Amino acid sequence: MAPARVCSLLLSRPAVPGRSNVHRRLRAPLLALPLAASLQAAGSEPVSAQGLDSLAAVRAVAADTLDGCARISQVFVDNHAVFDPTDSDLDPRFAWAYGFANRLHIPTREGVIRREILFREGQCYSPELLLDSERLLRNTTFIADADIYGIRQPDGTYHVIVDTSDEWSTRLEPRVDPRGGGLSGLELREDNLLGTGQHVAAFWGQQYDETVYGAAYATPQFLGTLLDAELAVAKTANGTLFAQSLSYPFRGEAGRWAWRQRVEHEDRYFEYFTPGEDKLVRVLFPERRRAMDVGGVFRLGRRGNLTLLGAALAGEWIIYPGGARFADEEDAVEGTVPLLLQRPTAFDTVSSLRVVFLAGQRSVYFVRRSALDAVRGTEDVRLGVEAEVALGRSLQAFSSDDDLSLNLGVDVAGELPGGLLSGARVLLEGKRDYGAPVETWEWRNVFGQADAWAYWRPSPESRHTVVGAVTAAGGWRTTVPFQLTLGNRSGLRGLPRNAATGARRAVFSLEDRFYIGWPYPQLFDLGGVAFVDVGRSWAGGYVFGTDPEFFASVGVGLRTAFPPGSRRTYRLDVAVPVAGGGGLSDFVVSVGVGQAIGRVLRDDPQIRRSSRRTLSASLFNYPN
């Protein structure tokens, strides 16, 4: 192999938008310059002692490749700072800022990166494992970008270059009260403690006129292993929180086994909105929830067509200690005190221990796209089909209910003509009560959630991305505390969180996201957005439900990411209602991390607080 061929391999991979890659490809040869020199010597010298050595090497390779694979002889890790000083695209005017940021940031340790990749020296060279390893690294909170490629050697083996860039890992994130726009809390987090990939965080805030605070710790490499560990402790508005988990997730598409153990204790308020004299009034019912699960999943099949089978033991214990109270003192007047007597049914003690059987089918592939949910960065997008089912039978000796839980989930996504990306997800769960009276409906606590999304970008160079999303949620035949609200927490960003209540809800959103590229694109990414949200709720016969007309809101916002090309996006939105009541003076300000709508689908928090959903197979996929 000639030296020109080596340079061709080093420069052949495509550039990643938002990051300069050519200089990295030119730095990688610093590791391979001795290799190029040896190639020149091997190519120009006649067969002699050196030639005999080469012949011996070929014979050694032949022996090594009898099993049909070429080996990896060397793995080089080349990790770059948040701002790479050799990047010619950086603005020299901000050299002081780049240097200051790099000095504040501790680089990721090489051993941390090596543990995340799926291959080692001496193993077979597999392009698929290289691609999976790239996604694993990019999926972490401390790596902004990863590029892995191999260089074939004269002896038939491969040198593999792992080229990574660190993510800025220290964050101070404010929490804004959507009702008044004031500061309601702060969170300080470090996602790469001392370059080890460990996450630590502390937060403080106000909730229901009570001071809350806590701390969290997480690591993807517990005690130097491939185990994920998480721990969180907090003071809540009416008690304490403790959560701990230890898991071994599927690593890429080649992983066969995954398991998880988790325990949780949480004191919280279940918040109801009830009709007052001229508005909806918040009433709080104290709830204490404890849960545990331990289980494992096995995958069989080939990449792109995987079947998942698993089992778990899951338990949940819920009590409702103490009496209800108003969230706002001004509501505690003589005319509204009787509202506290409207205690919803089903605030009964729950004790459940069940065996859960899991099954699923995963037929997915990944593509890379730019400026979808990131301002300008490149993201991994999962396409294909994934379906799952979980059946959980209660153990009567340890449970207050005799039932069977059923959970179904389907997730599809694909590319359509014209540069359109779209997808949808449906979740459905319920329980069959074997102790239900004769001639009554046995299925109860049926909850459903459906989400659909679409992205359209006129061209890869366009500064605009149009995003549409539809979300719907509902509950049927509920015997547990349950209520949905329609407002800014559910997607209508120009409304207060308690605009309407009910048992069903649907929201449609449309956004035009655009990259501004000003004032300092070499220092941070800045983009804007214009959006419209339309939605309504349905009472569904619910005692605390309303049945209003459609609501609508419009707004604008800013999106920013630091450093340029980062996938972590911060957003600031200002929205006003245009239908269903209110006016320009009733604007709502919201601040958050990540986009408000899109393909990053989340479980509806108001469904989850009422649901007794057991484990699902998708929880073990990483990255999912």
Model-derived features: where do they sit?
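Outer-membrane beta-barrel channels and translocator barrels
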Residues: 120, 143, 167, 193-195, ...
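Bacterial N-terminal signal peptides
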Residues: 29-40
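C-terminal transmembrane beta-barrel domains of outer membrane proteins
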Residues: 3, 386-624
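Transmembrane beta-barrel wall of Gram-negative outer-membrane proteins
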Residues: 218-324, 342
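Feature captures outer-membrane beta-barrel proteins of Gram-negative bacteria and organelles
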Residues: 184-193, 211-224, 242-253, 261, ...
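Outer-envelope beta-barrel architecture signal
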Residues: 69-73, 158, 168-170, 182, ...
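Transmembrane beta-strand segments that form the barrel wall of outer-membrane beta-barrel proteins
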Residues: 117, 150, 168-178, 184-207, ...
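Periplasmic polypeptide-binding modules associated with outer-membrane biogenesis and secretion
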Residues: 46-190, 201-205, 210-219, 232-243, ...
